[in-house]
Amino acid sequence: IYSKEEFNGIGHGGTEQYGAFSYKPGFAINPLKFVNGIAKYALSKKLKIFEHTKVDKIDKENSSYILRTKEGSIRSKKIVVATNGFYQEGLIPQMDGRVLPVISNIIVTRKLNEDELNAHNFKTFSPIANTKNLLYYYRKLPDNRILFGTRGDLTGSDQSNLAMSKKMEKFLKNIFPKWSN
């Protein structure tokens, strides 16, 4: 747990913080880079990758799972269901009715120079989230851009995305007023 002063001392000087707590270990992940890394590793081991292959059924036999598709079956000792909230009901009964899609909206600033980052004492690469009803999360990217996100609306339409983008820009400027340009 950090006081406001301690939080500022580790490299975050936005206007809305009153302190913080930190998860250890905690990190941010780029899902595309993660899955590309897994694919690269699998290919280096001469494994086959079946993209865009719908699993129709999962059966358990002894200590293995059998994933059944129209094209064939795959046997595995372990499986990971990574759906991003778009789960196929009936595939794993324990998950039915428990997974909801969540739309997230993200904006990214231009590359900020050191003076701009220092204006808000933004030094940390740790991901930061607030605890308000409309949660915001943000982090510094390796090239000094700030990724700023929040939950999206329920429709995900182009019109609502544009409105949400403008709203997010306003929130970002409120938290970091010295970046208002």
What are these regions (language model features)?
Residues 1-5:
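Dinucleotide-binding Rossmann-like beta1-alpha1 core, especially the glycine-rich loop
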Residues 14-19, 147-149:
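A short alpha-helix capping/helix-coil boundary motif
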Residues 6-15:
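Flexible hinge/switch segments at interdomain interfaces of large molecular machines
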Residues 55-57, 63-67, 72-115, 119-181:
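Active-site substrate-recognition segment that forms the wall
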Residues 18-77:
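Helical element adjacent to the flavin cofactor pocket in flavoenzyme catalytic cores
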